[in-house]
Amino acid sequence: MGTEEYRRIRVLWPDHLNLARGKYLPARLAERGTRHCLSVFSLGYDRDMGPTPGTGFLEGMPDMECHFDVSEIRPGWEDGVGVVVGDLERNGKPVPLAPRTVLRNAVDAWTQMGFKPKVGIELEAYVMEPDPNGGWRPYNAPGSMVYGTGIRSDPEGIMQAIDETGERLGFRIESMNGEFDMGQFEMTLEFDDAMRCADEVFLFRAMAMEVAAQKGHLLTFMPRPIPEFGGNGLHVNLSLEDSSGNNAMLDPSTPDGLSALAKSCIAGQLH
């Protein structure tokens, strides 16, 4: 797609904290890209900043450029707004700290060895509702259970709203269900090439949180937002496709079905 059917373009990129940072651009100016301060990579969750190497913090907090392919602009979840994931550069070179740069380098390394990384992501999150003191409390869904569905697990239809919005926008949702604790849900997207999968999950999370906010709730993917409840997982399912399109992790001739490459990958993770 291009910019013609949109009033504004929302250019987003993931930072080192997995926060969706970006800017809105008038559609007529979108092809120029945009700029952001490189030193945002020195921020912590508490907004404290320090002289982190590579962030330009002590060099005047310089700008970096955000570029994107106009053909990758897609319908957003706000009226009249298209959305796209951008790449970060400085002086014509990729920003080393940018997560998309790190992932692209890893994908390129596997490609040079003759493999294509394929990834599937399972997300877990809690829905929170406002409490009388201005904070947040667990979503009141006493009928919820692991693998729960329907109104008993989600009385206000938060997941239904996310699912309907996601399908309308072209997200390839594989499944949604209640998870272990009250107000906890699992959302899974279909398997894909590593970069596309990461971009899809990044945008899906942003969309899901904002759809929940529109309904007056907070959707959080924090590892353990409620100390008394179980934590949220993030499951990364990885395989490698060889030049013939086969799963290079699979070897049916072995007792466990794993190839030598798969065992080497597991050993590397453990190391």
Regions found by a protein language model. Give the residues of each.
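Flexible loop/turn segments at secondary-structure boundaries
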Residues: 16-21, 127, 182-183, 226-230, ...
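Accessory "access/gating" subregions that flank catalytic or transport cores
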Residues: 151-155, 159-162, 167-173, 187-192, ...
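Metal-centered catalytic cores of metalloenzymes
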Residues: 177-181, 194-197
